[in-house]
Amino acid sequence: MKLMHLSDLHLGKRVNGFSMIADQQFVLEQILDLAAQEQPEAILLCGDIYDKTVPSAEAVELFDEFLSRLAELAPVCIISGNHDSAERLAFGGRLLQKARVHVSPVYDGTVSAVELSDEFGPVQIHLLPFLKTAHVRRCFPDAEMETTTDAIRVALSGIDLADGKRHVLLAHQFVTGSERCESEEKSIGDSDNVASSVFDGFDYVALGHLHGPQRAGADHIRYCGTMLKYSFSEANHHKSVTFAQLGEKGNLQITTRPLKAQRDLKMLRGTYEELMAREFYLGTDLPESYLHITLTDEEDVPEALNRLGTVYPYIMKLSYDNTRTRMRQNPLEAQAEPENSPLELFDLLYEKQNNRKMDREQQEYLTKMIQSIWEDSL
């Protein structure tokens, strides 16, 4: 059974003020073409369909068109991610089932499943929406769970993985040891980390949440990554669609098909004169790419953004890196990169004020306090 694995569409996303709708539509057409070529038996959408819990009208319209055409090619299984509203995404779910679209309902203590079959027998596809410990604790108040790993283990405990069937899981969590990008939502310390061992027994685990395609602790546990580059930390990514081919139980093959963006997202560095030299950009895709330009001139270039924009009209970010900017950089700002979690930022502030880092006991206490506040707000 061939499965097409997608996640983190983030429809309606804006990157540095630029709308990605046209770029998303361009790549979604490629995905539809790939689905028609590869003819998968099921298509898995593993969360973060939208970029916001209340998506824009144009994002909803784009997904409606994409989903309608996708469901004509194969059954579609969808779970909600941390950027989605589980309630809004699940609206009309029972009606959608008649059109071969299966959406994870709001979590109520059970994990919904879809059963498909091929020449090797049945395949159970389990739909686990994005969960925090608080969501699971509400449904299992007497269960012991200190970590998100405990919570996910409890949530999956009702699935019989010893029935001889092949089992596929859709999930939207951060698996410990995986590589993050700056465009992803940060957790408090390691509070949302999930050990890959909770997925033991599944034949394939289709993950969403992280933007870089990667295995997560084992070959059968995988993130497919985003279809587009959504931050400059992804500038070197090669975006693709993942296909998982399930044979008889225990037999799994993974392949990928590349995706090409309408506009690439790149980082440029150099002096103003270097970047504006015709021989530098002629014959390249730089004038049509989204760019973060870092000028290394020692003096600010007057009207730099406007002047650079005559050659590079899609500049998302302009910054300087020279002796002056490095000297005036605040020590905390120098360390507080966009990928720092809230706990890491507290740790940096504590170190700046006290000339030492928090000890383990202080970190654990702070993590529990912040986690408790976040859970109370859910």
Feature-to-residue mapping (PLM):
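N-terminal active-site segment of His-dependent metallophosphoesterases
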Residues: 1-66, 71-72, 361-372, 376-377
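Conserved catalytic scaffold of divalent metal-dependent phosphoesterases
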Residues: 91-192
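Active-site neighborhood of phospho(di)ester-bond hydrolases with catalytic His/Asp-centered motifs
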Residues: 6-7, 43-47, 76-82, 102-107, ...
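Divalent metal-coordination and catalytic microenvironments
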Residues: 8, 28, 48, 63, ...
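Metal-dependent catalytic neighborhoods of phosphoester/phosphodiester hydrolases
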Residues: 16, 49-67, 80-99, 105, ...
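Conserved beta-sheet core of the metallophosphoesterase superfamily
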Residues: 95-98, 181-252
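Accessory, non-catalytic peripheral segments of nucleic-acid enzymes
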Residues: 37, 42, 246-378
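Active-site neighborhood of divalent metal-dependent phosphoester/pyrophosphate hydrolases
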Residues: 40-58, 75-87, 167, 173-190
